[in-house]
């Protein structure tokens, strides 16, 4: 057969060995479908069918390390068993393992044999129609040299390695005979994030360990489920306090219900987040636009894909001090434009301070730093003064938020708007509720705190109030949950420790060695410590004396009660006891008379 642009081309060794990742197959499918004469595969959904047909023809990978199309293992096993079993079935056939009858039928249809170990040739029947314009296999022929890369097919995802496939989260048994359901049912939609379907059935700890083994060096994030507008909604928490715009963007899409995760999913990897984001960017492509708008959109998509991997670490955002939405134009800002997510900052110059306005002007942050360096080296005193004022402005607003900027943010952000806020080189999800700005709490330390979802942004110091998902202030701990006896014991222990500490400090003070130049404050502190020590010692002595009295009183009463207990007749003869009570009284009266008589003498 003569090689023509439409005829299949020989596969490379890397393809036969199973080193082609699913995103490459997806990119090639999108590129050929868009540039081909059959129409746009992305718009019509042919890309998903092509990817599904590719998976059905080559089988799912059977090990975590085998992330490609998996053709190498099938061809090697087929070559060792029978020559006919190494044939690659054409599109439309769902079984992967080739029986002798299937091999004979394939040989009768004219499928090409396998050549050397380095290359293989896949030929399909000329009479088979192609309704969708998508390639018949993920291991398809390379694009012609004159082809321009399609910008809506995730062309720049090569630096993200390969996304996890669904077989990595399923059992390895029966991987060769599994038939994708989307091929049988004729599903034509774009591929969704399949690897997350089994998360809800597996132990999160096992999934976390498996994810770290399969994707070494990748970040794993925990998911917190909240009740957002009466809907069970997930948000991604952050394990490290670093610049991570990926989480801020995904949380905006999750709160807006534009991206959905499987129910009760608890962990997710960074690569899976990138896959969700890439799928949404493809779905959000405008359908009916003019040719000029389409070219502009494709250029923006190309620029966004080139920096998409930076979302995991940080974006180079260069703010201007004149407006809350004024940034220097960089490719990093195109991502927010494509996703239609507003990006704000609050690092503004107060227009009422003329010298700062004159020193800063319309400079961006990078330009202002360069201006400060040049002004310091200048011989002009006016330039030196401007550089000093600009440097003071940066030092005084190190939190990257001013009160003027906070006021502008409050008036600019729309009610209920979900956006991304840039401050302290960190990206946060922000919204506005009843005229008050709130930042989404994504710290992993609050993963189990269901009542802590938002934090108010009402000053530049960063000491906001925590609120729940309905923007109610977090109530204090329930008094019933605090054990009173335990709290009393804690208070007593604290007072005892404080008393012992004060006593020890007072004993260490040597009043004879007090320097003459001691200040009044230090002398007053020492006197107060001595007074506290004496007071505590006095109270301790009082308590000990009271304890001695309480212990001696029962003993004396017991000694007085022994004679009464010794005579059993005292109980039966009440008259005798009355006489005994009267006798001491009479003796006391006689003594008083004797005293009085002595006084008269």
From Swiss-Prot:
Biased composition (Basic and acidic residues): 24-34, 577-601
Active site positions, chain numbering: 244, 426
Domain of life: Eukaryota
GO MF terms held by the record: cysteine-type carboxypeptidase activity; cysteine-type deubiquitinase activity; K11-linked polyubiquitin modification-dependent protein binding; K48-linked deubiquitinase activity; K48-linked polyubiquitin modification-dependent protein binding; K6-linked polyubiquitin modification-dependent protein binding; K63-linked polyubiquitin modification-dependent protein binding
GO CC field: nucleoplasm
Function noted in UniProt: Hydrolase that can remove 'Lys-48'-linked conjugated ubiquitin from proteins. Can also bind to polyubiquitin chains of different linkage types, including 'Lys-6', 'Lys-11', 'Lys-29', 'Lys-33' and 'Lys-63'. May play a regulatory role at the level of protein turnover.
Name this polypeptide is given: Ubiquitin carboxyl-terminal hydrolase MINDY-2
Protein's organism: Mus musculus
């Amino acid at each position: 057969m003569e090689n023509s642009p439409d005829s299949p081309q020989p596969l490379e060794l890397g393809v036969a060995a199973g080193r082609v990742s699913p995103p490459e197959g997806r990119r090639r499918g999108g590129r050929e479908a868009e540039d081909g004469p059959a129409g746009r595969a992305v718009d019509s959904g042919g890309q998903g069918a092509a990817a599904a047909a590719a998976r059905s023809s080559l089988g799912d990978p059977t090990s975590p390390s085998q992330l490609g199309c998996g053709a190498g293992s099938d061809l090697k096993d087929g070559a060792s068993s029978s020559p006919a079993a190494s044939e690659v079935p054409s599109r439309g056939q769902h079984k992967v393992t080739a029986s002798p009858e299937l091999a004979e039928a394939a040989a009768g249809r004219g499928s090409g044999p396998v050549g050397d170990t380095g290359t293989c040739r896949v030929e399909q029947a000329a009479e088979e129609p192609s309704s969708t314009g998508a390639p018949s296999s993920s291991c398809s022929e390379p694009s012609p040299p004159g082809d321009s890369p399609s910008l809506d097919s995730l062309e720049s995802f090569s630096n993200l390695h390969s996304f996890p496939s669904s077989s990595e989260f399923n059992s390895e048994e029966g991987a060769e005979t599994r038939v994708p359901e989307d091929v049988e049912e004729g599903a034509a939609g774009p591929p969704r994030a399949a690897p997350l379907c089994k998360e809800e059935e597996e132990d999160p700890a096992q999934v976390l360990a498996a994810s770290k083994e399969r994707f070494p060096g990748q970040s794993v994030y925990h998911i917190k489920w909240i009740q957002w507008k009466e809907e069970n909604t997930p948000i991604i928490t952050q394990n490290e306090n670093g610049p991570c715009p990926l989480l801020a963007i995904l949380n905006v899409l999750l709160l807006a219900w534009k991206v959905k995760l499987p129910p009760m999913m608890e962990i997710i990897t960074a690569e899976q987040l990138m896959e969700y984001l890439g799928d949404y960017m493809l779905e959000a492509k405008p359908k009916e636009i003019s040719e000029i708008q389409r070219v502009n959109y494709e250029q923006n998509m190309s620029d966004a894909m080139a920096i998409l991997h930076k979302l995991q670490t940080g974006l180079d955002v260069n703010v201007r001090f004149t407006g809350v939405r004024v940034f220097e134009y960089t490719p990093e800002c195109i991502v927010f434009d494509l996703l239609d997510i507003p990006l704000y900052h609050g690092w503004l110059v107060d227009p009422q301070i003329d010298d700062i306005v004159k020193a800063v002007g319309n400079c961006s942050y990078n330009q202002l730093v360069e201006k400060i360096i040049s002004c310091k080296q200048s011989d002009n005193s006016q330039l030196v003064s401007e550089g000093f004022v600009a440097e003071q402005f940066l030092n005084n607003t190190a939190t990257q938020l001013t009160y003027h900027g906070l006021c502008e943010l409050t008036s600019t952000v729309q009610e209920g708007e979900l956006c991304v806020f840039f401050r302290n080189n960190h990206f946060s999800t922000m919204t506005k509720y009843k005229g008050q700005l709130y930042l989404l709490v994504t710290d992993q330390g609050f993963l189990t705190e269901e009542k802590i979802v938002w934090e108010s942004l009402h000053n530049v110091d960063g000491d906001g109030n925590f609120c729940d998902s309905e923007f109610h202030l977090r109530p204090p701990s329930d008094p019933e949950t605090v054990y009173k006896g335990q709290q009393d014991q804690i208070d007593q222990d604290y007072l005892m420790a404080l008393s012992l500490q004060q006593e020890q400090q007072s004993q260490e003070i040597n009043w004879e060695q007090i320097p003459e130049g001691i200040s009044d404050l230090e002398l007053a502190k020492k006197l107060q410590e001595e007074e506290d020590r004496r007071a505590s010692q006095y109270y301790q002595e009082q308590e000990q004396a009271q304890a001695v009295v309480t212990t001696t009183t029962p003993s004396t009463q017991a000694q007085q009660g022994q004679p009464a207990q010794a005579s059993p007749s005292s109980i039966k003869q009440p008259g005798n006891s009355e006489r005994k009570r009267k006798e001491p009284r009479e003796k006391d009266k006689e003594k008083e008379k004797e005293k009085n008589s002595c006084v008269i003498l």
